[in-house]
Design a protein with these regions (language model features):
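N-terminal amphipathic/basic leader segments beginning at the initiator methionine
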Residues: 2-52
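Short N-terminal or domain-adjacent regulatory/targeting segments
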Residues: 40-67, 267-278
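Glycine-rich phosphate/diphosphate-binding loops that line cofactor/substrate pockets in enzymes
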Residues: 58-74, 101-104, 239, 279-288
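Histidine-anchored nucleotide/phosphate-binding helix
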Residues: 83-102
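Short internal beta-strands
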Residues: 106-114, 246
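Short, aromatic/basic amphipathic alpha-helical patches
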Residues: 121-133
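Conserved, well-structured core segments that form the ligand-binding/active-site neighborhood
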Residues: 135-282
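Conserved small/polar residues in nucleotide/adenosyl-binding loops
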Residues: 291-293
């Protein structure tokens, strides 16, 4: 069959794989359609847009007001598996919460690894930038260390809730993440930094188990009736979250929108934007889909 492949009648596309992508060639006659991000312009001045999001958040007072009077802070960030511009996001957040009176020594940046490996050394610098790595306490979550977690009871569907104690004990709780389609939670971002991000293996084992994953609503782009989304939202609210800062990226991984504020309201604002640029429909069933997320 390989000898019958005619490159002149093929189409070429690049899948998001690794850091540089993976180019593949397919017989043009077999391709029904290529689905891509709809046209969306990256932010012309992302720093100014982020500053505006922090000053005019959705569902909460401005970040500096939320932080005023707090004695300590824990900021959750995604690990190296997510293309989040953490340094760009963290710098104004750190600046504002210190202006509000929280000492640098009372701030913990916690990498929400879930059950992924820790990000250390050069990888940690790549994640947050040299300046932040050198001057702030940046630590990894270890989901398989039960002594690092605090028990908060059970969720409505019986998920045991064990959350990283460093986050639970912080006076100000902030999550920083990325909103994009997710294969089981509907969309990433928002509540996912807490569960599974800083949950223990005992929590993740149930939440990420077949009882939830096999549900027909636990799928990409679906929030309504999705038990995975509903459970980790409930768990995140139980753990507490004072403020979120989430980014939406374009197809070149450039910031297209920032949302900030209330964990649910700001997240849903970001989801609405993502839906407007990524949701599309194939007109008929196909035999095979090549998907990169």
């Amino acid at each position: 069959m390989g000898n019958d492949f005619d490159e002149s009648a093929s189409m070429s596309t690049v899948l998001a794989y690794g850091k540089s992508g993976l180019r593949v060639q397919l017989p043009a006659r077999n391709v029904v359609r290529t689905l891509r991000y709809k046209s969306v312009s990256p932010l012309q001045d992302p720093d100014a847009s982020l500053a505006q999001a922090l000053a005019e958040p959705t569902g909460t007072p401005p970040l500096i007001e939320v932080a005023t009077g707090r004695s300590s802070a824990c900021i959750l960030i995604c690990d190296i598996t997510r293309p989040v511009p953490n340094e760009q996001l963290l710098k104004p957040i750190l600046n504002q919460i210190q202006q509000a009176g929280i000492a640098r020594t009372d701030i913990t940046i916690l990498i929400a690894t879930g059950l992924h490996r820790p990000n250390e050394g050069d990888e940690l610098v790549e994640l947050v930038g040299q300046e932040i790595a050198d001057n702030y306490r940046v630590e990894n979550h270890f989901g398989e260390c039960p002594e690092d977690h605090e028990y908060l009871g059970e969720s409505p569907r019986g998920v045991p809730i064990w959350i990283d104690r460093r986050y639970i004990e912080a006076d100000l709780k902030i999550t920083v993440g990325l909103i994009e389609p997710h294969f089981m939670a509907g969309y990433s971002g928002g509540r996912k930094l807490i569960c599974p991000g800083i949950a223990s293996i005992d929590t993740i084992r149930v939440w990420h188990g077949p009882r939830f994953l096999e549900h027909p609503q636990a799928t990409t782009g679906c929030l309504d009736g999705n038990p995975v989304h509903e459970e980790n939202t409930w768990i995140a609210k139980r753990a507490g979250c004072d403020f979120i800062v989430n980014v939406v990226l374009d197809d070149q991984r450039r910031p297209a929108k920032f949302v900030a504020g209330d964990m649910e309201a700001a997240f849903l604002e970001g989801v609405d934007f993502v839906r407007s640029v990524v949701v599309d429909t194939v007109e008929r069933p196909v035999d095979l889909s090549l998907i990169h997320i």
